[in-house]
Structures are given as C-alpha cells and as structure tokens.
C-alpha cells in the first residue's frame, strides 16, 4: 500500500505488466472482491448506486467517528489532559450516525436493501459498541441488523477465526 497501512490484498490471478494486482483501502477492496465474485455488489443501477452511497457513508463517517470514539473512550484517558470535549463530541456524532442507520433500517433489512458490501463494511464498526459505551438497544433497528448479520454463517466463521484478538460482543 502506498499509504503503508493495512488493509491491502494482492490478487495473483490479476496482473498488470506481470505484477500481481494490489488493492488497498477497505472500500476499494470490497468493491473489487464484490465485482470479481459477482456477489454483494450489484452491477446495475439503481441498486449499485444505493450500495455505493452506504459504502461511502461508512468510509467517510461511521468508520472514522467510531475510531475517534474508541480513541477518546479507551486510550486518551491514559494521557494527561482533559479529553471530555473530544470524547463527548465523537460519542454524539457516533450516536447521530447510529440514528441515521436506525431510520433507514426501519424501512429495509439492510442498508442498501439487500445484504451488500455496505453492510460488510459497516458491521465491524458496530461490533465494539460496548467499548464505545453505547446502548445498542436504543437503536432497535440497528440492533436487529447487527444480530442478523452476526448470525450469518460466514460472519460467525470470521468471528471465530478472530476471537482471540477481536473485541466482538
């Protein structure tokens, strides 16, 4: 990755000038894999655009705000200074974003209608809600969505693989 950060994948089956293709950043990876596999990423309008809206909403909003909440709730207290403004600001924004999810999920089962890369991208940012000091039951539709995705066999398998290093609820 030019950013020297994870995630990145390398596809040896797809090469550019004899060099395996590398794809970095979560959203780009999910789009690439969705297109390659022909799953969870519609190929036609308007469904594709709906998935892209929610994928970019996660990449630009939910993920960064959850990361900030996690930092100020779990790590900043280990450093001197008053971090209460920052913690409150990011907790409020994370709650606002959960409210956005809750409203849209009152109308449909998944963010873009059918289960998609938008849900795959968003799910990890909800899994640590207890660490963020959030009562997920306040957002009943998000809770239903979360429980539904968490019960999917492939998701269960992934959680099991990472159970020793992840903080899933």
Q: Where do the model's predicted regions map?
A:
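GST-like domain detector, emphasizing the conserved glutathione-binding G-site
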Residues: 1-88, 92, 102
């Amino acid at each position: 990755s030019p950013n020297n950060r994870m995630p990145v994948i390398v596809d040896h089956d797809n090469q550019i000038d004899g060099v395996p293709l590398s794809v970095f950043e979560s959203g780009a990876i999910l789009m690439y894999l969705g297109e390659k596999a022909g799953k969870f990423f519609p190929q036609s309008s308007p469904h594709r655009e709906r998935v892209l809206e929610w994928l970019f909403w996660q990449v630009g909003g939910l993920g960064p705000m959850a990361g900030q909440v996690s930092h100020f709730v779990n790590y900043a207290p280990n450093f001197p200074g008053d971090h209460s403004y920052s913690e409150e600001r990011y907790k409020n924004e994370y709650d606002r974003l959960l409210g956005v999810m809750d409203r849209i999920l009152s109308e449909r089962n998944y963010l873009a209608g059918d289960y998609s890369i938008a849900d795959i991208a968003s799910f990890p940012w909800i899994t640590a809600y207890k660490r963020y000091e959030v009562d997920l039951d306040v957002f009943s539709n998000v809770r239903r969505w979360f429980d539904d995705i968490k019960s999917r066999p492939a998701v269960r398998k992934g959680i099991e693989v990472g159970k020793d290093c992840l903080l899933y609820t």
